[in-house]
From Swiss-Prot:
This is Circumsporozoite protein. Residues 315-334 have a biased composition (Basic and acidic residues). InterPro entries: Crcmsprzoite (IPR003067), TSP1_rpt (IPR000884), TSP1_rpt_sf (IPR036383). Keywords: Cell membrane, Cytoplasm, Disulfide bond, Glycoprotein, GPI-anchor, Lipoprotein, Malaria, Membrane, Repeat, Signal, Sporozoite. Glycans are attached at T370. It is found in: Cell membrane; Cytoplasm. It is a lipid-anchor; GPI-anchor. SUPFAM superfamilies: TSP-1 type 1 repeat (SSF82895). Residues 355-407 form the TSP type-1 domain. Sequence repeats lie at residues 110-113, 114-117, 118-121, 122-125, 126-129, 130-133, 134-137, 138-141, 142-145, 146-149, 150-153, 154-157, 158-161, 162-165, 166-169, 170-173, 174-177, 178-181, 182-185, 186-189, 190-193, 194-197, 198-201, 202-205, 206-209, 210-213, 214-217, 218-221, 222-225, 226-229, 230-233, 234-237, 238-241, 242-245, 246-249, 250-253, 254-257, 258-261, 262-265, 266-269, 270-273, 274-277, 278-281, 282-285, 286-289, 290-293, 294-297, 298-301, 302-305, 306-309, 310-313.
C-alpha cells in the first residue's frame, strides 16, 4: 500500500514537471508572449487608439426667411391717378460776354509788364495773381516773398528752383511735398530735418541712406519699419535697442542672432519662442529659467542653472518613490484579469520607466508584470551614451508584453504538498 502511494505521487509529480502546458504552473520567463506592437512615445496616445468614442450627429434646422422685393411698382398707377405734369424750367437769360481789350490793369505801384491782377509792388514779368513783393519771373499763384524762378504754388520763403508744393524754408532742389527745413535732394514726403538722400516717408533726424519708414534716430542701413535706436542691419519690425543682425519681431534687448519671436534678454542662438532668461542653445518652447540643453516641454519653474534633467539626488528620491508605486501597481496587476487585451495603464507605464531609469540599457528590460499585460523598454541607439538623469521619453523604445499563463497559489500549495508526502513516505517507510 505504501509503495502504491509513493508510486502514485511520484507519477503525479513527474507528469506535472514534464508537461507544464497541461496544468496551471509555468515558467514566467519562458511563457512571455511579446507582441510586435511598438511605439516610441509612452503617453496617452497609446491608449487613445484603444478607446472607442461614440459621437451623435445633431440635426440642425435652419429657418429661411423669404424676401419679396417689389420692383417698379407705382401706387398711383394702381389707383389710376397718374399725373404727367412736369415743372417747367425757367429759361436762362442770355448773357452777353464782351471781351475786354488788352491793357495794363495792374494795381498801383506795379512795374511795367506785370499782368492784370498783380498787387502793387510786384516786379515786371510776374504772372497775374502774385502778391505784393514777388520778384520778376515768379509764376502765377506764388505767395509774397518767393524768389524768382519758383514754380506756381510754392509758399513764401522758398528758395529759387523749388518745386510746386514745397513748404517755406525748403532748400533749392527739394521735390514737391517736402517739409520746411529739408536739405536739398530729399525725396517728396520727407519730414523736416532729414538729411539729403533719405527716401520718402523718413522721419525727421534720419541719417542719409535710410529706407522709407525708418523712425528718427535709426542708423544708416536700417530696413523700413525699424523703430528708433536700432543698429544698422536690423530687419524690419525689430524693436528699439536690438543689436545688429536680429530677425524681425525680436523684442528689445535681444542679442544678435536670436530668431524671430524671442523675448527680451534671450542669449544669442536661442530658438523662436524661448522665454526671457533662457540660456544659449535652448530649444523652442523652453520655459523661463531653463538651463542650456533642456529639451522642449520642460515645465516652468525649473531653477536656472540646473543641468538637463533634475539633479542626481532628486532623481534618486524620485526613483525610490516610483519603485514603491511600481511595486504596488505590479501587485494590483497580478490580481486583475489575466486577459492580454487589457493594456497597461498610463500611470503604470510611467512608474515602471522611472523605476528602471538607472538600469536601462540597449537590451530589452524584463516585462513590467508577472501576469497579464505590461511593457518592456530599452534605450535607442542615439541615447546610448546619455546619463540616466538626462533620459527623456523620446530616448526610449517600448513595446507591450503579455503573460498568458500565470502561476497561482493552488499550484504552489499542490506542488509543495506533493514533495512533502514523497519525502515522508521515503524517509519513514
Amino acid at each position: 500500500m505504501k509503495k502504491l502511494s509513493v508510486l502514485a505521487i511520484s507519477s503525479f509529480l513527474i507528469v506535472d514537471f514534464l508537461f507544464p502546458g497541461y496544468h496551471h504552473n509555468s515558467n514566467s520567463t519562458k511563457s512571455r508572449n511579446l507582441s510586435e506592437l511598438c511605439y516610441n512615445n509612452v503617453d496617452t496616445k497609446l491608449f487613445n487608439e484603444l478607446e472607442v468614442r461614440y459621437s451623435t450627429n445633431q440635426d440642425h434646422f435652419y429657418n429661411y426667411n423669404k424676401t419679396i422685393r417689389l420692383l417698379n411698382e407705382n401706387n398711383n398707377e394702381k389707383d389710376g391717378n397718374v399725373t404727367n405734369e412736369r415743372k417747367k424750367k425757367p429759361t436762362k437769360a442770355v448773357e452777353n460776354k464782351l471781351k475786354q481789350p488788352p491793357g495794363d490793369d495792374d494795381g498801383a505801384g506795379n512795374d511795367a509788364g506785370n499782368d492784370a491782377g498783380n498787387d502793387a509792388g510786384n516786379a515786371a514779368g510776374n504772372a497775374a495773381g502774385n502778391a505784393a513783393g514777388n520778384a520778376a519771373g515768379n509764376a502765377a499763384g506764388n505767395a509774397a516773398g518767393n524768389a524768382a524762378g519758383n514754380a506756381a504754388g510754392n509758399a513764401a520763403g522758398n528758395a529759387a528752383g523749388n518745386d510746386a508744393g514745397n513748404a517755406a524754408g525748403n532748400a533749392a532742389g527739394n521735390a514737391a511735398g517736402n517739409a520746411a527745413g529739408n536739405a536739398a535732394g530729399n525725396d517728396a514726403g520727407n519730414a523736416a530735418g532729414n538729411a539729403a538722400g533719405n527716401a520718402a516717408g523718413n522721419a525727421a533726424g534720419n541719417a542719409a541712406g535710410n529706407a522709407a519708414g525708418n523712425a528718427a534716430g535709426n542708423a544708416a542701413g536700417n530696413a523700413a519699419g525699424n523703430a528708433a535706436g536700432n543698429d544698422a542691419g536690423n530687419a524690419a519690425g525689430n524693436a528699439a535697442g536690438n543689436a545688429a543682425g536680429n530677425a524681425a519681431g525680436n523684442a528689445a534687448g535681444n542679442a544678435a542672432g536670436n530668431a524671430a519671436g524671442n523675448a527680451a534678454g534671450n542669449a544669442a542662438g536661442n530658438a523662436a519662442g524661448n522665454a526671457a532668461g533662457n540660456a544659449a542653445g535652448n530649444a523652442a518652447g523652453n520655459a523661463a529659467g531653463n538651463a542650456a540643453g533642456n529639451a522642449a516641454g520642460n515645465a516652468a519653474g525649473n531653477a536656472a542653472g540646473n543641468a538637463a534633467g533634475n539633479a542626481a539626488g532628486n532623481e534618486k528620491a524620485k526613483n525610490k518613490d516610483n519603485k514603491v508605486d511600481a511595486n504596488t501597481n505590479k501587485k494590483d496587476n497580478q490580481e486583475e484579469n489575466n486577459d492580454s487585451s487589457n493594456g497597461p495603464s498610463e500611470e503604470h507605464i510611467k512608474n515602471y520607466l522611472e523605476s528602471i531609469r538607472n538600469s536601462i540599457t540597449e537590451e530589452w528590460s524584463p516585462c513590467s508584470v508577472t501576469c497579464g499585460s505590461g511593457i518592456r523598454a530599452r534605450r535607442k541607439v542615439g541615447a546610448k551614451n546619455k546619463k540616466p538623469a538626462e533620459l527623456v521619453l523620446s530616448d526610449l523604445e517600448t513595446e507591450i508584453c503579455s503573460l498568458d499563463k500565470c502561476s497561482s497559489i493552488f499550484n504552489v500549495v499542490s506542488n509543495s504538498l506533493g514533495i512533502v508526502l514523497v519525502l515522508v513516505l521515503i524517509l519513514f517507510h
